[in-house]
Amino acid sequence: MAAQVEIEDQTSVTNLDNGEIFDSISDDADSSVSHAGSSFSSSSLILLGEGNPEHDVIKTCLLSGMGVVSSDTTIVTISKNSSERGITTRAKFLAFRIFTDAVARKHGGDANVKYGWYAGSRDEIQRIISYGFSNRDVGKFENDGGSHGIGIHLVPSKCSLLAASATEQDEEGLRYLLLCRVILGKPEIIISGSKQSYPSSAEFDSGVDDLHNPRNYVIWSCNMNSCILPSYIVSFRSPRLRVSRGGFASRPSSPWVSFASLMSMLSTSMDPSRMNLIIRTYDDFRKRKIRRDQLVRKMREVAGDNLLAEIIKNHKNRNKVTN
């Protein structure tokens, strides 16, 4: 049976506007793959070659979300975590399917399964593929004052730049992303800086930063190995990608503007509720409760890159006129 890859809204494979991948590939549909293995040691991984439908749609999905650095981003390898390559891996696939069915029954037939990127080092992703997520992975979000609750954080597939900016480069200049299937069920909004670590009630299954346009999926530790299924590893190079200490990219060659000036300009372009969220985050930064990179992260999440870029551009132009 030929492998088939579709988009979640059942449109053409070339249409990635909604940023989601619907996986209708049968587990044994491994056409156009190399069984020579990937750079990772897990026996469950197979290397997908150019021309393989899964390889091509994942490559397109990642690059389409990389924004200004997409033209300088090179996909090196894409490896599939195959259920046909080991009893344990097969069991994880079956368990994920059972949990999908259970959540679907809970919510009238829709388990709300999405794809999300998880950023980590090569060793971290190797460990997750082999053993699953652990408290160590939860811990890095627990110590981040800007995170949306304490759990495993993933980024929607359409927001690959946000995920890529949190990757670590290895000695060969490679970065790694883990594309996972994620059972969201019914999510609830989790505010930045929240220390929530489990659903607020039995009604909810997961967390998001925004119900309508989420940039963060939060899976609680109690569900991290039942509601997240690691599916593909992507290794890539992106020389223009800039990663701050906290894991968020800055735009190349951006003109400088102080936070105080940026806050003043944002206040004329944003609604009060979003502006108040940025003000509270900025206040935490001034009190040294959060790091600079965490403030930048929150500004980008709330205001959006397009608005920030326009404000900085206008600020630069005004300075030219003044000078």
Swiss-Prot record:
GO cellular component: nucleus
Keywords, ordered alphabetically: Developmental protein, Nucleus, Stress response
Superkingdom of this protein's organism: Eukaryota
Pfam families per the UniProt record, alphabetical: RST (PF12174)
Subcellular location: Nucleus
Domain PARP catalytic: 31-257
GO MF, any single term: NAD+ poly-ADP-ribosyltransferase activity
InterPro entries documented for this protein: Poly(ADP-ribose)pol_cat_dom, RCD1/SRO1-5, RST
Induction summary: By salt stress and light.
Domain RST: from-to ranges: 250-321
Subunit text: Interacts with STO.
Reported function: Probable inactive ADP-ribosyltransferase that may be involved in stress and developmental responses.
Name under which the protein is recorded: Probable inactive poly [ADP-ribose] polymerase SRO2
Organism: Arabidopsis thaliana (Mouse-ear cress)
Gene from which the chain derives: SRO2
